[in-house]
Amino acid sequence: RMLEGYKSEFGGTITELKEEWLAERDRLSKVVFNREDFNPEIKSHFSQNILNEYADVLNTELPQTTALLTINDTIDPDSIIICAAGSLPGDLQRLWHSEVPNTYHLEYGYSCMGYEVSGTLGLKLANPSKEVYSIVGDGSFLMLHSEFITAIQYNKKINVLLFDNSGYGCINNLQMDFGNGSYYCEFRTDDNQILNIDYAKVAEGYGAKAYRANTVEELKAALKDAKKQDKSTLIEMKVLPKTMTDGYEGSWWNLGVPEVSNQEGVQKAYELKQEKLKKAKQY
């Protein structure tokens, strides 16, 4: 009775924000790469020539957000996903649409690289009748995926969805945002050639059913076929670097920046940090 007749002050704001989010989600699901003037979500880091080099070596033009939203729209709503580290948790937080409770399992706080695959096995043990999916980058997969073999060994079917941009993409973004060059976060050889690791072949060697999906059509087909399997699967997606979501307005990481530097980018990063700290809450 105390709330009888109460109306929220939000009015139509929530509806407007949801419509704005859906429009942005739709845009990011349809990103198309081109070799002349491609404008990725993470801007001003890699030149067009470098992006073209990745497209050639990895044999792909698939943006990360397009791949992720294709997965969201293709797998069953009651499937369970898990993710932990890299740029993918941020993408999921901004873009993933969950329709069924307890189907979205994210480890945000500690960014535990390698938790994804082992956590997926745990999800399967707790939910044996459901399809479970590990959403993982190539960096985290290389860090730890030993429980993938355990899942195969004990016939506990899990699905690994591996986003391969040939590097530690999230940390590469971070170092370049703070005025540095690209420093040892790209997977390149000592003569600067991009690595193209065949993760599907690795998975096949373990005894899993493996797929290579570098287009939306290939990804949809792989997801549908993987669901039919009675053993663990891995879908390898080669995705272009710098095609994850950006931070949008207000998102900022408080990291150490040198107060003194002869690099203009570092100087600007330090000035930005001081501006942001003035706006931060004093706990």
Model segments located where?
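Generic structural signal of hydrophobic/aromatic residues within well-ordered alpha-helices
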Residues: L17, W21-R25, I42, F46, ...
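Thiamine diphosphate
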Residues: R1-G11, L69, G90-D91, L95-Y283
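Glycine-rich, acidic loop regions that bind phosphate or pyrophosphate groups
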Residues: R1-R35, K227
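Short, isolated positions within intrinsically disordered regulatory regions of eukaryotic proteins
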Residues: E24-D26, I42, V100, G256-V257
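A diffuse structural propensity rather than consistent per-protein peaks
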Residues: K18, L22-E24, L28, N39, ...
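Secondary-structure junction/capping motif
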Residues: E9-E16, H45-F46, E53, L62-P63, ...
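Active-site diphosphate/adenylate-binding microenvironment
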Residues: V31-S118, L123
